[in-house]
Structures are given as C-alpha cells and as structure tokens.
A protein has these predicted regions:
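Channel- or pocket-lining gating/hinge segments that regulate access to a cavity or pore
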Residues: 159-161
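Beta-strand-loop-alpha-helix segment that lines the small-molecule cofactor/substrate pocket
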Residues: 156
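C-terminal binding/interaction regions
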Residues: 153
Length: 207
C-alpha cells in the first residue's frame, strides 16, 4: 500500500470507508480524539502490553517505521495510562503516524501541544510498571475487531475503522464511488430535496 493510498483513506474518513466496506471493521467503542482535527491512516503495528505495564510501548517505538499506527492494548482494557508526553515525544520524533490506545493516556495538554494524532479509550493519570514482556506484531482485538499487523487503520473524529490489506483496493474503489455519489447528492439536499423521496423511503413508509 503506497503512501498515496493511505492519504486517500484518511481523506475520505472513517464513516465513508466503513460504509463502503459493507459496514465492516468499525472499532465499536468510544474513542477520545486527543488532538482535535486529526485525520490519519496507516499500517498497524500491534502491541500487547502486560497487565498494568507499558514496557512494550517503549519497545514498539524502537521498532516502529515512519507512518506506522501503533495499536496499544492490555490483556483487558483498563483506565491505566500507557502513554504520556515522554513516550509521545519519542513516537513523534520517529515519525509514527498515530497512536490508538485501548487504555488511557495522560499529560493531555502536552500531547495536544505536540500534535501527534492520538486516540484513547480514557484519559487518566494512573501510571504503569515496566516489568512485563508482552508481544509486538501479533493480532490484537480492539472494540470487537481483530487487528493484524499491517492492517490499515483509518482514524478521525468519528473513531476508527480497520481494513485488511487484501481488501484495500476494493474498499478504496468503493469508498471513492460512495464519496462521488454523495458529492452529487448534497447540492440537491441543499436545494430542499429529501432522501425520503430520492431513496424511495416514502413508498416504503406510506405505500
């Protein structure tokens, strides 16, 4: 998958990609967009930390490639901060595209000033140990979706959606088609037409 294709996924955004993918791959939990306005897509580097521990986050940043989306998980989601400003600074310096944290983050004002796109399940100052060796680049589950290393993660204000690389070309084409269709529809809606009529819903409801 080229950088251009990642950029296109990011441009179309989570909702459009999710619908174009047949309503598949949505990470079905509330994610906090730490840096407002962030819109990113990139390949997943998956991380499973030990319970209450973030040693593997340090390892992940050391092994990350530019453009990676780090997917940070615990054995069970918990409001424990896996990332603060020091780790975020390192990730940013190594050109990580984004962090998806199925746990908490802290130092939020500093994170926003840094500007690294981060999505987390919680904001919490509660810290971790650094003792337990977990795993890198093995499948993890977030919000009911299994994420494998290299899966495309699309993130924006609506949350996150996962696209397997094997489906990327098909989903991107469907996304482009859906976006083009909506672009032609919007002026008609602005002019006062209704999807109730345009999509045949009136006939379904009223006969």
């Amino acid at each position: 998958m080229s950088e251009l294709d990642f950029t296109q996924f990011a441009r179309y955004g989570v909702a459009t990609v999710y619908e174009a993918a047949g309503q598949q791959g949505l990470i079905d939990e509330t994610l906090l967009q730490i840096v407002p306005g962030s819109r990113v897509a990139g390949p997943a580097l998956t991380v499973r930390c030990g319970a209450g521990d973030n040693l593997m986050v340090h390892a992940a940043i050391a092994h990350a490639q530019p453009g990676d989306v780090l997917v940070l998980t615990l054995p069970q989601p918990a409001p424990i901060s896996l990332v603060g400003d020091l780790l975020a600074i390192q990730a940013h310096a190594h050109k990580v595209a984004a962090l998806l944290v199925d746990a908490a983050v802290r130092d939020v004002e500093e994170l926003r000033a840094l500007g690294l796109p981060i999505w987390s399940r919680w904001i919490r100052a509660r810290g971790t140990t650094k003792k337990t060796v977990g795993t890198l680049n093995e499948p993890v589950t977030v919000g009911g979706v299994t994420i494998s290393p290299g899966d495309i993660i699309v993130l924006d204000a609506d949350g996150a959606v996962v696209v397997p690389p094997s489906q990327a070309a098909q989903v991107l084409q469907a996304t482009q088609q859906r976006d083009a269709k909506e672009a032609t529809l919007k002026p008609r809606l602005q002019a006062g037409e209704l999807t109730y009529d345009l999509h045949g819903y009136r006939a379904k409801v009223e006969g």
